[in-house]
Every structure is written in C-alpha cells, then in structure tokens.
C-alpha cells in the first residue's frame, strides 16, 4: 500500500495498492498495517489482513520493505525470516537508480543517503545477500527460503 503516484505500467492491486494519504492515515490509526514507513513525503505499508490471510492459507509471505518496516514485522512476527539485500557498492546502487530514470536528482540523493544508513543496520537481519549479480542473488535467496521449508 502506498500514497505515491503509480509509475508507468504499475497496476493498482498488482504492484501496490495506491491510496490517498487520508486513507493511509486511517489504516494506521485503525491498526490495520503490519508495518509502515514514510519516504520523501510518501507512505508505504503492508495491510495486516493481506499477510494474515496468506499465512492462514499456509502460504509463505514475501515482503519487499525497508529496515524500519522489517523491524516492525519482526516485533509482531518474531520468527519472520529477514534477508537484507546488500548492493555491491553505493556507486553501483546509484548507477542502478539513475538507470531507471524514474527519480528526480533530489530523490536519488535521498535514496542513496537512506541506503548508506540502512547498510549499517544489516546485522538486524537473519541473512545478508550481496546483490551484485541478479541470478546469483536470486539463487541464494531461494536457497535460504528452502532451508526454512
């Protein structure tokens, strides 16, 4: 769930649930989110009902969230498996972000500063995967997940 505007080719309900800031704040106040955070004026969060429904169906749930959100999840689900995706370097991360051509210069700089702060918190995660090669990182993540099944 997010309050940011959809990017080109993103579909509501598939990529994210796009909502207004008022709707998001109502979800926070009602305790409907398992985690949430704010970045550059936009809110991002995960509805509890979405996660609970999947878990009750016996499914595993994969969340792509930032460090504070992951900490909130672990507080609520202590046996959650956490994996920190470590970029090869901040220079490479910058190259990747700029390559998307979806962010202003200000947001690129904010993303890099946030990444530098988050990289220092990798020890909060059960696993760290170095994301220098997509295929290798994907295989390593799959192996970690298989070890818990």
Located regions from the model:
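Conserved nucleotide-binding/hydrolysis micro-motifs of P-loop NTPases
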Residues: 2-6, 67-69, 87-92, 134-135
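ATP-dependent small-molecule kinase phosphotransfer cores
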Residues: 2-61, 68
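A short acidic, helix-capping loop that chelates divalent metal ions and anchors anionic groups
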Residues: 5-11, 92-95, 101
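Conserved catalytic network of the ASCE P-loop NTPase/AAA+ motor domain
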Residues: 8-9, 53-56, 74-78, 120-122
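Residue-level signature of catalytic and energy-coupling elements of molecular machines
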Residues: 24, 62, 115, 129
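Conserved phosphate-donor/acceptor-positioning beta-strand/loop module used by diverse small-molecule
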Residues: 61-66, 75-99
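NTP-dependent small-molecule kinase module
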Residues: 79, 95, 99-103, 117-149
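Glycine-rich S-adenosyl-L-methionine
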Residues: 105-113
């Amino acid at each position: 769930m997010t309050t940011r505007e959809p990017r080109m080719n993103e579909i509501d309900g598939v990529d994210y649930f796009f909502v207004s800031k008022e709707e998001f704040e109502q979800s926070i106040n009602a305790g409907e989110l398992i985690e949430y955070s704010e970045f550059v004026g936009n809110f991002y969060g995960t509805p509890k009902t979405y996660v609970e429904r999947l878990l009750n169906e016996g499914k595993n749930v994969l969340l792509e969230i930032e460090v504070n959100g992951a900490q909130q999840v672990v507080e609520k689900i202590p046996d959650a498996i956490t994996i920190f995706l470590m970029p090869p370097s901040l220079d490479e991360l910058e190259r990747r972000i700029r390559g998307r051509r979806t962010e202003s210069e200000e947001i690129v700089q904010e993303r890099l500063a946030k990444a530098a702060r988050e990289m220092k918190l990798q020890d909060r995660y059960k696993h760290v995967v170095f994301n220098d090669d997509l295929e290798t990182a994907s295989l390593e993540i799959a192996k970690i997940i298989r070890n818990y099944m």
